[in-house]
Amino acid sequence: MRLYIRAKTDSLHAPEIVVFEKTEHLCQQKKMKDMENTSIINGRRIASDRIAELGENEIFVFGSNIHGAHGGGAARYAHQKFGAEWGVGEGLTGHTYALPTMEGDASLKQAVEHFIACAKAHPELTFLVTAVGCGIAGYTPDEVAPLFREAAPLENVYLPRVFWEVL
Protein backbone atom coordinates (compact mmCIF):
# COMPACT_ATOMS: atom_id res chain seq x y z
CA MET A 1 0.00 0.00 0.00
CA ARG A 2 1.39 3.40 -0.94
CA LEU A 3 0.51 6.45 1.09
CA TYR A 4 0.68 9.97 -0.28
CA ILE A 5 0.30 13.31 1.39
CA ARG A 6 -1.54 15.78 -0.77
CA ALA A 7 -0.16 19.22 -0.17
CA LYS A 8 0.82 22.28 -2.10
CA THR A 9 4.33 21.94 -3.37
CA ASP A 10 6.84 24.41 -4.62
CA SER A 11 10.19 23.98 -6.29
CA LEU A 12 11.89 23.30 -2.93
CA HIS A 13 9.59 20.58 -1.61
CA ALA A 14 8.15 17.36 -2.94
CA PRO A 15 6.16 15.86 -0.07
CA GLU A 16 4.70 12.99 -2.09
CA ILE A 17 8.16 11.74 -2.98
CA VAL A 18 9.46 12.11 0.58
CA VAL A 19 6.48 10.28 2.07
CA PHE A 20 6.69 7.53 -0.54
CA GLU A 21 10.38 7.01 0.22
CA LYS A 22 9.72 6.84 3.96
CA THR A 23 6.85 4.41 3.42
CA GLU A 24 9.01 2.17 1.23
CA HIS A 25 11.78 2.29 3.84
CA LEU A 26 9.35 1.32 6.62
CA CYS A 27 7.98 -1.53 4.51
CA GLN A 28 11.52 -2.79 3.90
CA GLN A 29 12.28 -2.59 7.64
CA LYS A 30 9.07 -4.55 8.39
CA LYS A 31 10.01 -7.25 5.87
CA MET A 32 13.46 -7.55 7.45
CA LYS A 33 11.86 -7.89 10.93
CA ASP A 34 9.56 -10.64 9.63
CA MET A 35 12.53 -12.47 8.13
CA GLU A 36 14.29 -12.48 11.53
CA ASN A 37 11.57 -14.77 12.90
CA THR A 38 12.02 -17.40 10.22
CA SER A 39 14.57 -19.05 8.00
CA ILE A 40 14.46 -21.71 5.32
CA ILE A 41 17.32 -24.19 5.27
CA ASN A 42 17.26 -27.17 2.90
CA GLY A 43 13.52 -26.67 2.40
CA ARG A 44 12.83 -26.71 6.13
CA ARG A 45 10.87 -23.72 7.41
CA ILE A 46 12.46 -22.94 10.77
CA ALA A 47 10.95 -20.69 13.45
CA SER A 48 13.45 -18.64 15.42
CA ASP A 49 14.21 -19.62 19.00
CA ARG A 50 13.86 -15.95 19.96
CA ILE A 51 10.78 -14.11 18.73
CA ALA A 52 10.65 -10.53 20.01
CA GLU A 53 8.12 -9.07 17.58
CA LEU A 54 5.62 -10.46 15.11
CA GLY A 55 4.80 -9.41 11.58
CA GLU A 56 1.23 -8.50 10.70
CA ASN A 57 0.14 -12.06 9.79
CA GLU A 58 2.49 -14.00 12.06
CA ILE A 59 1.09 -16.18 14.83
CA PHE A 60 3.12 -17.25 17.89
CA VAL A 61 2.29 -20.91 18.66
CA PHE A 62 2.95 -21.83 22.28
CA GLY A 63 2.26 -24.49 24.88
CA SER A 64 -0.40 -23.75 27.48
CA ASN A 65 -2.66 -25.53 29.90
CA ILE A 66 -6.29 -26.27 29.10
CA HIS A 67 -7.44 -23.55 31.51
CA GLY A 68 -5.47 -20.83 29.71
CA ALA A 69 -3.65 -19.77 32.87
CA HIS A 70 -0.70 -18.26 31.04
CA GLY A 71 1.49 -17.84 34.11
CA GLY A 72 4.90 -19.08 32.98
CA GLY A 73 7.26 -19.80 30.11
CA ALA A 74 6.18 -19.16 26.54
CA ALA A 75 2.54 -18.91 27.66
CA ARG A 76 3.30 -15.94 29.87
CA TYR A 77 5.30 -14.33 27.07
CA ALA A 78 2.44 -14.92 24.62
CA HIS A 79 -0.02 -13.33 27.04
CA GLN A 80 2.14 -10.30 27.83
CA LYS A 81 3.54 -9.64 24.37
CA PHE A 82 1.24 -11.04 21.68
CA GLY A 83 -2.31 -10.92 23.04
CA ALA A 84 -2.96 -14.49 24.21
CA GLU A 85 -6.20 -14.26 26.19
CA TRP A 86 -6.23 -15.44 29.78
CA GLY A 87 -8.67 -18.34 30.09
CA VAL A 88 -8.20 -19.59 26.51
CA GLY A 89 -6.13 -22.78 26.60
CA GLU A 90 -6.48 -23.82 22.96
CA GLY A 91 -6.80 -21.97 19.68
CA LEU A 92 -6.29 -18.55 18.14
CA THR A 93 -6.33 -15.41 20.27
CA GLY A 94 -4.52 -12.16 19.53
CA HIS A 95 -1.45 -13.02 17.47
CA THR A 96 -1.13 -16.42 19.15
CA TYR A 97 -2.26 -20.01 19.00
CA ALA A 98 -2.43 -21.88 22.32
CA LEU A 99 -1.77 -25.62 22.43
CA PRO A 100 -2.61 -27.37 25.71
CA THR A 101 0.43 -29.44 26.66
CA MET A 102 -0.14 -30.21 30.34
CA GLU A 103 -3.05 -32.65 30.09
CA GLY A 104 -1.35 -35.76 28.69
CA ASP A 105 -0.29 -37.36 25.42
CA ALA A 106 -3.75 -38.00 23.95
CA SER A 107 -4.88 -34.44 24.63
CA LEU A 108 -1.71 -32.99 23.10
CA LYS A 109 -2.05 -35.16 19.99
CA GLN A 110 -5.64 -34.02 19.49
CA ALA A 111 -4.69 -30.36 20.07
CA VAL A 112 -1.92 -30.59 17.44
CA GLU A 113 -4.44 -32.09 15.00
CA HIS A 114 -6.74 -29.10 15.65
CA PHE A 115 -3.78 -26.75 15.11
CA ILE A 116 -2.90 -28.38 11.78
CA ALA A 117 -6.52 -28.04 10.63
CA CYS A 118 -6.43 -24.36 11.59
CA ALA A 119 -3.16 -23.79 9.72
CA LYS A 120 -4.63 -25.44 6.62
CA ALA A 121 -7.76 -23.28 6.90
CA HIS A 122 -5.72 -20.07 7.22
CA PRO A 123 -3.00 -20.00 4.54
CA GLU A 124 -2.90 -16.20 4.91
CA LEU A 125 -1.34 -16.61 8.37
CA THR A 126 2.21 -17.70 9.18
CA PHE A 127 2.43 -19.91 12.26
CA LEU A 128 5.70 -19.77 14.21
CA VAL A 129 5.74 -22.88 16.39
CA THR A 130 7.82 -22.85 19.56
CA ALA A 131 9.15 -26.07 21.08
CA VAL A 132 5.68 -26.65 22.59
CA GLY A 133 5.60 -29.09 25.47
CA CYS A 134 9.39 -29.14 25.84
CA GLY A 135 9.57 -26.68 28.73
CA ILE A 136 7.34 -26.72 31.79
CA ALA A 137 5.24 -29.65 30.45
CA GLY A 138 8.35 -31.86 30.48
CA TYR A 139 8.20 -33.52 27.06
CA THR A 140 11.25 -33.99 24.84
CA PRO A 141 11.46 -32.99 21.16
CA ASP A 142 11.57 -36.73 20.34
CA GLU A 143 8.11 -37.08 21.90
CA VAL A 144 6.47 -33.94 20.47
CA ALA A 145 8.02 -33.42 17.02
CA PRO A 146 6.36 -36.49 15.41
CA LEU A 147 2.96 -34.98 16.22
CA PHE A 148 3.83 -32.14 13.82
CA ARG A 149 4.83 -34.41 10.91
CA GLU A 150 1.66 -33.49 8.98
CA ALA A 151 2.41 -29.78 9.52
CA ALA A 152 5.91 -30.06 8.04
CA PRO A 153 4.84 -29.69 4.38
CA LEU A 154 2.53 -26.72 5.09
CA GLU A 155 4.11 -23.58 3.68
CA ASN A 156 2.64 -21.36 6.39
CA VAL A 157 3.99 -23.37 9.33
CA TYR A 158 7.52 -22.85 10.67
CA LEU A 159 8.72 -25.43 13.18
CA PRO A 160 11.53 -25.06 15.72
CA ARG A 161 14.95 -26.40 14.75
CA VAL A 162 14.76 -29.05 17.52
CA PHE A 163 11.61 -30.50 15.90
CA TRP A 164 13.22 -30.60 12.45
CA GLU A 165 16.17 -32.51 13.94
CA VAL A 166 13.70 -35.26 14.90
CA LEU A 167 11.57 -35.16 11.74
How should these model regions be labeled?
Residues K31-L167:
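Macrodomain-like recognition of ADP-ribose-binding/processing modules
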Residues R2:
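Catalytic zinc-binding patch centered on the HExxH motif and its immediate surroundings
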